[in-house]
Amino acid sequence: MMFFKMQGLGNDYVYIDCINGKEPIDIKNLTNRLSNRHFGVGSDGLILLCKSKVADLKMRMFNSDGSEAQMCGNGIRCAAKLAYELGLICEEITTIETLSGIKTLKLNIVNGKVKTVEVDMGAPILEATKIPVSSSAKIEDKKVKAEVKVKNKKIELTCVSMGNPHAVTFVNDIKNFKVAEYGPILENADIFPEKANIEFVEVVDKNNIKMRVWERGSGETLACGTGACSSVVASSLNGYTDRKVNVQLLGGNLEIEWKPNNHVHMTGPAVTVFKGEWIDE
């Protein structure tokens, strides 16, 4: 089985072309094995490029634990790059179907290769039941607020969905914050019926934030596109930043803009690392 290893700011996935080939049968098991960084290819998960009846193509995304996710911002940029360079799509503007809806993408092409991709991520979801977060959450001036107690410390969260659930908390020293300690507790908190991706954000100024992320089903990763979008929405709603923000992640920077039409746009790189053949012994 041929595959491609790709990454967006270090958020890396294994990609399989299921338009010219067949979809794997036991996807969860395959994802577990491919994602293993010692005994497999090594990745944050698996992404399948599939045929779509409503868009140019369909993206199915699986976390490293085999669970299927609605959307991945870094993953969809790489999916668009791969589709273009394989000849599955031919235009600079394309559409990709995901479990969180159809996304429109603009490809920046240099010498026949896709360098960066701008994604219209759609409008943020700011209704508690649709994020989803339990009824214990409070609504404060369009913000969905929640509190989780971790080791006798109350962690305040601003909850947002970009097609998948996110909870953003603001910290003073992101570099030394114990993400691996707090992340899994917050991810699995009872207030999140579908669990949640957790963003830890340090505000630098009105146009810059630093972010680390604990991804649902994957743990801490170097970057998360939907997380960056959610963090900018939360930062803006809380009055910490403007609506156009440079997000500094462990793997690099993303440009996020919450447009006047309420849609969030994300621009960032997409890189092919290598292609190979998975030998299933």
Q: Whereabouts are the PLM-identified features?
A:
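Extended Gly/Ser/Thr-rich low-complexity repeat segments
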Residues: 128-139, 275-280
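N-terminal, positively charged, Ser/Thr/Ala/Gly-biased leader segments
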Residues: 1-22, 119, 137-160
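Selected transmembrane alpha-helices and immediately adjacent juxtamembrane segments
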Residues: 156-157, 165-168
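Membrane helix-loop-helix hairpins that form the core translocation module of multi-pass transporters
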Residues: 115-124
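A glycine-rich beta-to-alpha transition motif near the start of alpha/beta enzyme domains, typified by
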Residues: 1-113, 167-281
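Membrane-interfacial helix-loop segments of redox and metal-homeostasis proteins
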Residues: 160-162, 184
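Glycine-rich beta-alpha junction loops
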Residues: 123-125, 162-166, 270
